[in-house]
Amino acid sequence: MPKRTLQGVVVSDKQAKTVVVRVDRRFTHPIYKKTIRRSKNYHAHDENDQFHPGDMVWIEESKPISKLKRWTVVRGEPKKTA
């Protein structure tokens, strides 16, 4: 069974070797047929502390690393500055 992979944005990097990633999902309400956007925060392991708030990252499911961390950062793109 393949590991799940999610795409999200880093919202916090204040913990050591950990980033908090916000993952957005969209779905259609079953009764009202309106498209709704929901988000969820995941704690992910960042071994080298290389990602910062605003960076786009991909996280992959892993074995439990701590009480809250069950995801690992696989790759990422730096925040675009204009």
From Swiss-Prot:
CDD domains noted in UniProt: Ribosomal_uS17 (cd00364)
Q: Name one GO molecular function term.
A: structural constituent of ribosome
UniProt keywords (A-Z) are: Ribonucleoprotein, Ribosomal protein, RNA-binding, rRNA-binding
Which Gene Ontology cellular component terms are annotated? cytosolic small ribosomal subunit
Q: Which InterPro entries does this UniProt record tie to the protein?
A: NA-bd_OB-fold, Ribosomal_uS17, Ribosomal_uS17_bact/chlr, Ribosomal_uS17_CS
* UniProt-listed GO biological process terms: translation
The record's listing under Pfam families reads: Ribosomal_S17
Q: Which PANTHER family match?
A: 40S RIBOSOMAL PROTEIN S11 FAMILY MEMBER, SMALL RIBOSOMAL SUBUNIT PROTEIN US17M
Q: Which family does it belong to?
A: Belongs to the universal ribosomal protein uS17 family.
Stated role: One of the primary rRNA binding proteins, it binds specifically to the 5'-end of 16S ribosomal RNA.
Q: How does it assemble?
A: Part of the 30S ribosomal subunit.
Give the protein's recorded name.
Small ribosomal subunit protein uS17
